[in-house]
């Protein structure tokens, strides 16, 4: 059984991994290369090598009730979508509540993680770190890699002939912090993911003109969904997930297309994906269509060539006098402290069992946490990964044979390509609810709906038709939390609480309003029949 566990990184995945280690009675030590927790969500004015970077205005794309850890709801007065500083505040509250800071060695860089000579029998690792210029060695029974995958910028300059002639400024979106200094400029943003769209919208408020280039187009969703509820609280239900799994693919694609076009017609805005039958991750942005309507942003096709001052696009159009090019072209990822044979990265892909475990190790004592991109919140996903991993380390859960794991990796990759395509940005993509259930099943934390229908039908209905959030995985099994049921039944109140900033009359007036509507309808019917009688 693993006892001493090295956790690399004190971002979201690192913090929840620490807690899961403590919950299972393991002895974690976390190595964080910077001076504080939070990882990518801790904004800093300057870009730092080896550290994820965000712009000052970043707001979460997943809502608080769908993003909180399973036994620690966010404060009810927190907004539904959080500015990065507010999310960091939650992580600080979380770390303090569970006393996690004492396990973290700050300003400590992991230089290497190597198998011990007797690894085949012990499963142990030699971890070399550096702090204040001094190297230290330590042996650990297991390692959790939580270093993230938004550190190494991907800038495919060879795909942009003429970039060497371009006289303006160009840089990766990782270096963008705020709109200051870009006033009155003509700006080209290459790439229309979440970051590219956010940056284009923000710059368009004061720039002379913003262009955004997209190779394949994209669906754009608002954070606001039916009846004003957060999109993910509506989209991610077990019922809807079941429909997407059992209906024919063509029907599912048609439904998704109709849903995406309900807000605005993507074809009219030049955004409709070329292959709209691939379930590409949509962009979450509330302002893109508005800025397009205002002409502040213009959608362009793929850049064919760049000159000293202009951009030539594949459709033959040319935009002159470009001052700035921002490459919002995503990230590559690597693990420089690991031997290539441990977690091999090829074409921005890794072969890991359930996106977590290398399949070829004699002992399953190395795991990657958070190296995934679900169509939902990463926080509950990383938590379930860590809960399973720590139980594997402890010997309470076991993995199948190497052959079985490799077959799963191959089939999972084929399914991913079939659903999401082969783009580099989609290599870590997976279905949200299905993946959470898969992990929960491994540790015995998936709720039994048939049983609940008889024992607690009210809760069963909420689980199936309501938001599929992390509390569901604390109802049963190891780590069961007595507050889980109440958290599920009261989540609507926490969603609405931060919106109740203006005193209104009691909501019971709704019933009076409804009654008046019924009476009005009856009056219309009576008037109609009276008219027939007199005619």
From Swiss-Prot:
Crosslink Glycyl lysine isopeptide (Lys-Gly) (interchain with G-Cter in SUMO): position given as 492
Positions bound to FAD: 9-13, 32, 40-41, 61-62
Regarding the membrane, this protein is recorded as: Single-pass membrane protein
Which Pfam families does the record associate with it? FMO-like
Q: What class of enzyme is it?
A: oxidoreductase
Its subcellular locations are:
Microsome membrane; Endoplasmic reticulum membrane
Molecular-function GO terms, alphabetical: flavin adenine dinucleotide binding; N,N-dimethylaniline monooxygenase activity; NADP binding
ATP-binding among keywords:
no
Entry's Gene Ontology cellular component terms? endoplasmic reticulum membrane; membrane
Q: Which residues cross the membrane?
A: 510-530
CC cofactor: FAD; Mg(2+)
Locate the coiled-coil region(s) and give their ranges: none
Which Enzyme Commission number(s) are listed?
1.14.13.-
Residues with N-acetylalanine modification: 2
Q: Which SUPFAM superfamilies match?
A: FAD/NAD(P)-binding domain
The residues listed in the UniProt record as binding NADP(+), with positions renumbered to this chain, are 60-61, 195-198
Q: Does the keyword NADP apply?
A: yes
Alphabetical UniProt keywords: Acetylation, Endoplasmic reticulum, FAD, Flavoprotein, Isopeptide bond, Magnesium, Membrane, Microsome, Monooxygenase, NADP, Oxidoreductase, Transmembrane, Transmembrane helix, Ubl conjugation
Q: Which InterPro entries match?
A: FAD/NAD-bd_sf (IPR036188), Flavin_mOase (IPR000960), Flavin_mOase-like (IPR020946), Flavin_mOase_2 (IPR002254), FMO-like (IPR050346)
Query: Could you tell me which PANTHER family the record lists for this protein?
Result: DIMETHYLANILINE MONOOXYGENASE (PTHR23023)
What this chain does, per the record? Catalyzes the oxidative metabolism of numerous xenobiotics, including mainly therapeutic drugs and insecticides that contain a soft nucleophile, most commonly nitrogen and sulfur and participates to their bioactivation.
Give the similarity note. Belongs to the FMO family.
The entry's protein name is Dimethylaniline monooxygenase [N-oxide-forming] 2
**What is the scientific name of the source organism?**
Gorilla gorilla gorilla (Western lowland gorilla)
């Amino acid at each position: 059984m693993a006892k001493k566990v090295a956790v690399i990184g004190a971002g979201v995945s690192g913090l929840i991994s620490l807690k899961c280690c403590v919950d299972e009675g393991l002895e974690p030590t976390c190595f964080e290369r910077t001076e504080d927790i939070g990882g990518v969500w801790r904004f800093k004015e300057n870009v730092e090598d080896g550290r994820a970077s965000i712009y000052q205005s970043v707001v979460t794309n997943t809502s608080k009730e769908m993003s909180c850890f399973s036994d620690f709801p966010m404060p009810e007065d927190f907004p539904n979508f959080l500015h990065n500083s507010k999310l960091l505040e939650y992580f600080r509250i979380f770390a303090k509540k569970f006393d996690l800071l004492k396990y973290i060695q700050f300003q400590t860089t992991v230089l290497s993680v190597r198998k011990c000579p007797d690894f085949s029998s012990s499963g142990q690792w030699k971890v070399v770190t550096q702090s204040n210029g001094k190297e230290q060695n330590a042996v650990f029974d297991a390692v959790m890699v939580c270093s993230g995958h938004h550190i190494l910028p991907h800038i495919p300059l060879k795909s942009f002939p003429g970039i060497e002639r371009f006289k303006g400024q160009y840089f990766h979106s990782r270096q963008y912090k705020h709109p200051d200094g870009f006033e009155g400029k003509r700006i080209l943003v290459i790439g229309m993911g979440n970051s590219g769209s956010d940056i284009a919208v923000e710059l368009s408020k004061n720039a002379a003109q913003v262009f955004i280039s997209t190779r394949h187009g994209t669906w754009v969703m608002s954070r606001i969904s039916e009846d004003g509820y957060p999109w993910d609280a509506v989209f991610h239900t077990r019922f809807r997930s079941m429909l997407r799994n059992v209906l024919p693919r063509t029907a599912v694609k048609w439904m998704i297309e109709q849903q995406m076009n309900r807000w605005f017609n993507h074809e009219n805005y030049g955004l409709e994906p070329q292959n709209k039958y691939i379930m590409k991750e949509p962009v979450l942005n509330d302002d893109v269509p508005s800025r397009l309507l205002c002409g502040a942003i213009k959608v362009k096709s793929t850049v064919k060539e760049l000159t000293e001052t202009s951009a030539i696009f594949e459709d033959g159009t040319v935009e002159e006098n470009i001052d700035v090019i921002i490459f919002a072209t995503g990230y590559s990822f690597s693990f420089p402290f690991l031997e290539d044979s441990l977690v091999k990265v090829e074409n921005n892909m890794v072969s890991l069992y359930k996106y977590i475990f290398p399949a070829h190790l004699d002992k399953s004592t190395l795991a990657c946490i958070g190296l995934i991109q679900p169509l939902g919140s990463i926080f509950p996903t990383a938590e379930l990964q860590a809960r399973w991993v720590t139980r594997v380390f402890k010997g309470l859960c076991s993995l199948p044979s190497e052959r079985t794991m490799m077959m799963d990796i191959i089939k999972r990759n084929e399914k991913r390509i079939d659903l999401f395509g082969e783009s580099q940005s989609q290599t870590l993509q997976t279905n949200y609810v299905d993946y959470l259930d898969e992990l929960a099943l491994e540790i015995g934390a998936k709720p039994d709906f048939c049983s609940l229908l008889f024992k607690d039908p009210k809760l069963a209905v909420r689980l199936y038709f309501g938001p599929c959030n992390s509390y569901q995985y604390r109802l049963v099994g190891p780590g069961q939390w007595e507050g889980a049921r109440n958290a599920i039944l009261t989540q609507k109140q926490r969603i609405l609480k931060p919106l109740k900033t203006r005193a209104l009359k009691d909501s019971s007036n709704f019933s009076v309003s409804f009654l008046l509507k019924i009476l009005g309808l009856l009056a219309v019917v009576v008037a109609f029949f009276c008219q027939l009688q007199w005619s």
